[in-house]
Design a protein with these regions (language model features):
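N-terminal Rossmann-like NAD(P)+-binding domain of SDR-like oxidoreductases, especially those catalyzing
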Residues: 1-179, 259
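Structured loop/turn residues at secondary-structure junctions
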Residues: 182-185, 244
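Amphipathic alpha-helical segment in the mid-to-C-terminal domain
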Residues: 148, 186-187, 218, 249
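Heptad-repeat alpha-helical coiled-coil signaling segments
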Residues: 178, 184, 211-213
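C-terminal substrate-binding subdomain of Rossmann-fold SDR/epimerase-dehydratase oxidoreductases
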Residues: 28, 59, 198-270
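A general structural signal for well-ordered alpha-helical segments in protein cores
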Residues: 104, 157, 190-191, 249, ...
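Short, amphipathic alpha-helical "lid/cap" segments that border enzyme active or binding sites
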Residues: 64, 108, 190, 218-226
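Generic structural signal for conserved hydrophobic packing positions in ordered secondary structure
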Residues: 39, 89, 193, 206-209
Length: 270
């Protein structure tokens, strides 16, 4: 497979949970990595120190000029920067469209105008599919987003494909399911369960524990991202990232309780 040694790679949202793992894997390949992050949720201490091939720039994808400047001379773009927390999208819908849709358009258009960008990997979300009409959910599953977050991400996907058709924009759309691993924090489901268990919560309050999720470890999600960036045949395609194995939230609680060696009870929804 293609080597990314000395490849100029931009990671928007590179100080986040998934982005920082991408930074580590790409630096291990010898790539020249630029992180572009506003540090609203990403952390500088997630990133390695003292690596001469790592450049960190504080900036926001809603700032078109800043995006143009940072995209210049890049060869690969991994676009992860987003507002990701679904409940917030119900209260701040305009902000979600400003960042997830308009901000993404800034990244896409800057790449189109660049003379050096070979591939943009846009990290979308499985949330755009809505409730499963069948399982496993494949790339042909109908899109039926139920949150402003999901709609804002789907709008960015559609914009990316329009640019691909009209301008030859070299984009790959990846739709991860539930990614977990180090630096994954509350209030997302796995750290939320672990947090409640370790705090000694008498009855874990998790909502509907009969719902199911497909979980992928963060290093595997990032490997898929890097593979997509290297594969020219992936350009213009949608690719789901998941394990094709689902687990009930209630069963997940049982597994985590056994690992922690702490007995737990679950508060049932009335």
């Amino acid at each position: 497979m293609t080597s990314f040694r000395d490849k100029a790679i931009l990671i928007t949202g590179g100080a986040g949970f998934i982005g920082s793992e991408a930074v580590n894997q790409l630096l291990n390949e010898g790539a020249k990595v630029t992180v572009f992050d506003n540090f609203s949720s990403g952390k500088k201490h997630y990133l390695p120190k003292g690596n001469k091939k790592l450049r960190i720039i504080k900036g926001d994808i809603t700032n078109e000029r800043a995006v143009i400047n940072v995209t210049k001379d890049q060869e690969i773009v991994l676009h992860l920067a987003a507002l990701p927390f679904i409940p917030d999208s119900f209260y701040y819908p305009v902000d979600f469209f400003k960042v997830n849709t308009i901000g993404s358009m800034h990244v896409f258009w800057s790449a189109v105008k660049s003379k050096t960008v070979e591939t943009v990997v846009n990290i979308s979300t499985s949330e755009i599919y809505g409730s499963a009409q069948y399982t496993p959910m494949d790339e042909n599953h109908p899109t039926s987003p139920y949150s402003t977050y999901a709609v804002s991400k789907l709008a960015a996907d559609r914009a990316a494909f329009t640019l691909h058709k009209e301008n030859g924009f070299p984009v790959v759309i990846l739709r991860p399911f539930n990614t977990f691993g180090p630096r994954y924090t509350e209030p997302y489901i796995i750290p939320e369960i672990i947090g409640q268990i370790l705090r000694g919560t008498k009855e874990l309050n998790l909502g509907n524990v009969n719902s199911t999720r497909d979980f992928t470890f963060v290093s595997d999600t990032v490997k898929a991202m890097i593979s997509a960036a290297k594969e020219k045949k992936a350009i213009g395609e949608i690719i789901n990232i998941g394990s094709q194995n689902e687990i009930r939230i209630g069963d997940l609680v049982t597994k985590l309780s056994k690992i922690a060696k702490i007995k737990t009870k679950i508060k049932r929804d009335e």
